[in-house]
């Protein structure tokens, strides 16, 4: 028996990295998982990983998966993700918004198109998806919404002149917005028994994207494997909703607080 038996989950940005790891972990605990992202076939992205591969890995392990090709920047695609999930798997009990588009560019160099795309994928998409799944969650008496954030949402704790993170301002702004959205929505739906949380890695997760941007590397001291985020996400998406809601949580700290071993691989 898995802790998510009978549950239906949507995980966006699930072609690789944190999203794929969360999807596999949820499926291993019994959830039927809809994996959504743009990359459906190898060669469509400069990064390895597709939703077809994630879905195949889940099925190979005996789980249930639905691959949904979608561009999270498009409102119609967000609607289709939920509609296809409902049609093929049932009403979603869990929503994990993980999809991201990132440009590490100083503010002066940002184009209007880049800004709009980042905001659409990282703020508007989680907002609209939450709107779409909330009625079904409320009807069934419970639900779990998890928005993946980043330590970039916090102000740098060192003097500005010593801060080496030039180019992360817009990314951090988007993540700060999603954290405020998460805590505010948690208050709005508390009486409906729906948990809403934001979760960040304690350290940088080596994914194709973070490695490409030279933020970390495999086995680096400043890194943690994606399994840590997946385990923390599981905690926030299966316990009694009112017991863990309104959190801006960090993966390793959350696992330590709840006395859950940190998976290192």
PLM segments and residue spans:
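Conserved glycine-rich Rossmann-like NAD(P)H-binding loop of the short-chain dehydrogenase/reductase
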Residues: 29-53
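Conserved glycine-rich cofactor-binding loop
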Residues: 8, 15-16
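Catalytic loop of short-chain dehydrogenase/reductase
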Residues: 146-191, 202-205
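The beta1-alpha1 cofactor-binding region of Rossmann-like NAD(H)/NADP(H)-dependent oxidoreductases
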Residues: 49, 69-80, 112
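Substrate-binding pocket helix/loop in short-chain dehydrogenase/reductase
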Residues: 106-107, 114-116, 159
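C-terminal helical subdomain
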Residues: 191, 198-199, 216-265
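A short, exposed helix-loop element centered on a Lys and neighboring polar residues
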Residues: 130-131, 183
